[in-house]
């Protein structure tokens, strides 16, 4: 069987996903293609979905700005994606479109690959910076993993509170409080767009401990200003391009049932991004 896979979103011309998934196909000895299907805001999203429904597809990824919009066109949505309110992976089985979200599991896999000593140690104190879709996915993945000491800091507090919901073991705080309390956290995860293609950090990092693990899910630039500041305080740095790799791995598993070996791919992605 030849797999037919796509990525829908806008803009996506510089996406790493085709390279990643075509590498997965090679490593798994599977035949198939992974192609971009760009839908600009000026186009009818519904018409494009109709076109996709008429084509022979194995599945597709969904990225911004369509991770919520796609949900109304799906036949089923798995519990995790429903909880997150967003879908980034669609599998097509017997004509049914089934939605998933691999953001959270992708983040955890990438974190544990970088720092195996964190796996199973769920009493760590965690700070999530930002309250968008990625923060929601990562928060629920951490909660499902058993983490019970999580704070979410955001400029608009109500957005952080909406992610936490009724979870009694999590707390929404301001960015100012987060900067003051930084020394209390074992893991700090930057999920906002601040620092994407600009030398800015969402908060001052002067109070980070030397054994704190610091993540930034932004991968353009490869090393954000946030991570550059963190490196002055701690050696435990976790780059965003690795989350991209592992959320893709989880999507590929959904489509193919194959647990693809990603060994060395993080370094290859790093080299490609450095060349841009």
Curated annotation (Swiss-Prot):
Keyword check for Acetylation: no
Keyword Amino-acid biosynthesis: yes
Pathway membership: Metabolic intermediate biosynthesis; chorismate biosynthesis; chorismate from D-erythrose 4-phosphate and phosphoenolpyruvate: step 4/7
Biological role stated in the UniProt entry: Involved in the biosynthesis of the chorismate, which leads to the biosynthesis of aromatic amino acids. Catalyzes the reversible NADPH linked reduction of 3-dehydroshikimate (DHSA) to yield shikimate (SA).
Binding-site positions, shikimate: 15-17, 63, 88, 103, 219
One GO CC term, this protein: cytosol
Catalytic function, reaction form: shikimate + NADP(+) = 3-dehydroshikimate + NADPH + H(+)
Family membership noted in the UniProt record: Belongs to the shikimate dehydrogenase family.
Record-given protein name: Shikimate dehydrogenase (NADP(+))
InterPro entries the record matches: Aminoacid_DH-like_N_sf, NAD(P)-bd_dom_sf, SDH_C, Shikimate_DH, Shikimate_DH-bd_N, Shikimate_DH_fam, Shikm_DH/Glu-tRNA_Rdtase
The protein's assembly and partners: Homodimer.
Taxonomic lineage from the root: Bacteria, Bacillati, Bacillota, Bacilli, Bacillales
Spans through the membrane: none
Binding site for NADP(+): 79, 130-134, 154-159, 217, 240
Keyword line: Amino-acid biosynthesis, Aromatic amino acid biosynthesis, NADP, Oxidoreductase
Organism in which the protein naturally occurs: Oceanobacillus iheyensis (strain DSM 14371 / CIP 107618 / JCM 11309 / KCTC 3954 / HTE831)
GO annotation, biological process: amino acid biosynthetic process; aromatic amino acid family biosynthetic process; chorismate biosynthetic process; shikimate metabolic process
GO MF assignments: NADP binding; shikimate 3-dehydrogenase (NADP+) activity
Pfam short name (any one): SDH_C
Annotated active site: 67 (proton acceptor)
EC number: 1.1.1.25
């Amino acid at each position: 069987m030849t797999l037919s896979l796509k990525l829908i979103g806008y803009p996506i011309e510089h996406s790493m996903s085709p390279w990643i998934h075509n590498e997965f196909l090679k490593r798994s000895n599977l035949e198939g293609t992974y192609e971009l299907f760009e839908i600009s805001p000026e186009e009818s999203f519904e018409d494009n979905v109709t076109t996709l429904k008429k084509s022979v597809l194995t599945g597709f990824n969904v990225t911004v700005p369509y991770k919520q919009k796609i949900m109304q066109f799906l036949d089923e949505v798995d519990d995790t994606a429903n909880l997150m309110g967003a879908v980034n992976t669609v599998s097509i089985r017997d004509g049914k479109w089934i939605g998933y979200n691999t953001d959270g599991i992708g983040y955890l896999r990438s974190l544990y690959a970088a720092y195996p000593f964190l796996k199973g140690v769920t009493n760590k104190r965690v700070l999530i910076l930002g309250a968008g879709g990625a923060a929601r996915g990562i928060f629920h993945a951490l909660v499902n993993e058993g983490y019970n000491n999580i704070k979410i800091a955001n400029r608009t507090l109500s957005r952080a509170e909406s992610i936490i919901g009724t979870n009694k073991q999590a707390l929404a705080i301001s960015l100012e409080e987060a900067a003051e309390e930084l020394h209390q956290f074992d893991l700090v995860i930057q999920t906002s767009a601040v620092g994407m293609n600009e030398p800015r950090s969402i908060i001052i990092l002067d109070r980070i401990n030397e054994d704190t693990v610091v993540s930034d899910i932004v991968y353009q630039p490869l090393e954000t200003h946030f991570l550059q500041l963190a490196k002055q305080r701690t050696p435990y740095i976790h780059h965003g391009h690795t989350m991209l790799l592992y959320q893709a791995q989880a999507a590929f598993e959904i489509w193919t049932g194959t647990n693809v070996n990603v060994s060395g791919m993080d370094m290859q992605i790093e080299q490609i991004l450095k060349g841009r």
